[in-house]
Amino acid sequence: GECEQCFSDGGDCTTCFNNGTGPCANCLAGYPAGCSNSDCTAFLSQCYGGC
């Protein structure tokens, strides 16, 4: 999905999450379309130390 793509394209957490407006923003809201549970867990752990 676009969330994973953001990171694989070299985006960082600021870019990919962008305070709730980036392609990974949905991860923060509970894994809707474009982010699987495992993707979000990995990204959130990477970005926020397991938040």
Swiss-Prot record:
It is found in: Secreted. Disulfide bonds join 3-24, 6-16, 13-47, 27-40, 35-51. InterPro entries: Pheromone_Er2/Er23_protoz, Pheromone_Er23_protoz. GO terms for molecular function: mating pheromone activity. Keywords: Disulfide bond, Pheromone, Secreted. It comes from the Eukaryota. SUPFAM superfamilies: Pheromone ER-23. GO terms for cellular component: extracellular region. Mating ciliate pheromones (or gamones) are diffusible extracellular communication signals that distinguish different intraspecific classes of cells commonly referred to as 'mating types'. They prepare the latter for conjugation by changing their cell surface properties. This is Mating pheromone Er-23. The lineage of its organism: Eukaryota, Sar, Alveolata, Ciliophora, Intramacronucleata. The gene is MAT23.
